[in-house]
Amino acid sequence: MCGIAGILSKSNPVQVQELKAMTDIIYHRGPDGDGHWINETGNVGFGHRRLSIIDLSNHASQPMHFGNGRYTITFNGEIYNYLELRASLVKEGVTFSSNSDTEVLLALYAKKGVACLEELDGMFAFAIWDELEKVLFCARDRFGEKPFHYAFSNDGKFIFGSEIKQLFEVGIERKINQKILYNFLQNHHVLHDPRNPEQTFYQKVQRLEPAHYMIVTPDLRIQKKRYWDLDMARENHEISIQDAADKFYELMEQSVKLRLRSDVPVGSSLSGGLDSSTIVCLIDKLNTNQSIRQKTFSARFKNFERDEGKFMQMVIDSTNADPHFTFPDENKFVSDFKKVCWHQEEPFGGPSVFAQWEVMKLAKEQNVTVLLDGQGADESLAGYHYFFHTYLNELKRNNSPLYENELTAYRNRHNPNYGLEQSHSTNKQKSIEDKLKDLVRPIYRTFRPLKPESPSGQGTDFLNKEFTSQFESNEKLPEHTGGLKEQLYVNNCVIGLNNLLRFADRNSMAFSREMRLPFLSHHLVEFLFSLPNEFKIQDGWTKFVMRKAFETILPKEITWRVDKIGYEPPQSRWMENKEIKDLIESSIVDLEKEGIINKKRKATGKSDEWNSLVVSETLFN
């Protein structure tokens, strides 16, 4: 895990001080060393910050060269199957000078070009310069675990880096993307327009999309292409639920094994939910000799009814884990809020990001560099509660015999009407229009018309009309008319997951930690997408096939746990803290000066207050 930087210039030669400025600002991503390289003609330069994970020697330093200097790489991430790829390349006569996954990636590209991406199991963002062909090849992993931002300067340069702030260090204008800001403030979401997924909160800065590569020529022409996608047509109706559970276990075990490869200490995040508990219990089972106890890291919230400590303790009691806890509170939040915003770079939807921040800080204090985490399961296994609505609608629309059984099971297992639209509900007083706004506002808004409406449904006085009038139109986003599988695809590959991965990358790298996500093995995700919907939602349960797969290694209370929380802090209580209220008021005044908030404004809810706070600090300070 590292930080990358680079410049391709068609005008003035690249200067080493430019590259150094770009790597110095992301020291946190790689405190173990840095490197800079400029080619002989001066039109290409790479920078790198190193966090040593695989092969701790200087032989693995970057930028790295291969093929008698023809190829040069700057790479951030991990190639988990590098040992298998290396063995295959050695059989073909390739020789290596290091034991790193970086050199394996570079050699594989030299051998296969763009096709190398098909063979990578990992998380990555990298750039390779081919001195013979004079092309810059850039690529990002399938789900977007690792970031890649880029911009074009006014003086004829293509500039890229892991983080947005690097680009500002070399002259890219820090100009706010007003439309993205409007969507965030007006619609309460951090999701970008799916028609323009490369957009960021800054006009001049773009992000390379997940599962895409980009070729840049010396005259700065670019060609972008998707190299991987989920096969929506593939569906296995022959497999039994037990065989599917067994295969799930096999693929997950293999994914965890690969993600345990490291030359530095490895631990796990533990929230007490099904996903993180599965990883901790699986590692415990794999660690048969128990020579080193698995360290787990968790956030607890004192005197909060949704604290998940009892579930964490069940996992700890059933394994040989060495638990460590942090207790985020409003005082810690006030103390670190500006730091969190500086690292996150763009607005984020709530203080749960801070809980993850505290977990990463704790891991650093315990000298554990790599953490396995459970992100990615919900998006493939229909883990969020609103998927019930999508699934039941699909069953009803198709006149499926499963509809009545699933509706009854849902009502028996959950609050009878929670999250269901009026056509399913016994409570006619509240429909999906009301319920799902609270349940899943980010996803729900994505498929609504992009039209002006109050952040909390009580008028538009909070935002300045001169600001909002620029964007008030009848323009619509694509309507969501598909079923469960289509919405799972949207969550994985269009919106939703990419934001969570952004938060995770910035939080972990702020403390020079590496987060690895076993549920995002593309082999596993492809398999899960081939399963019928009823293996994911069945008998009122989400993630049904997963519960079946791991019920023998998990505490029963977690396997068949109905509720889902996910590091939810006591936000309402925190927002009543005097220091936080002062921060909020200061932020609203700042946004008044920017012409974004109405001077006669009145915040109509906690979301208005939070959005003002995070926008002011991330974008205007």
For the regions a protein language model found, what residue spans apply to each?
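C-terminal "lid/loop" region of Rossmann-like NAD(P)-dependent oxidoreductases
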Residues: 214, 298, 405-412
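Adenosyl-5′-phosphate
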Residues: 1, 7, 21, 115, ...
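Short, basic, glycine/proline-bearing loop/turn elements
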Residues: 339-347
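Short, flexible loop segments at the rims of nucleotide/cofactor-binding pockets, characterized by
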Residues: 191-192, 346-352
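Short acidic/histidine-rich active-site segments
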Residues: 368-384
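A mobile, often basic/glycine-rich helix-loop segment
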Residues: 380-410
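Short glycine/serine/threonine/alanine-rich loop segments
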Residues: 321, 346, 368
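Cysteine-centered catalytic environments shared across enzyme families
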Residues: 1-338, 356, 552, 557, ...
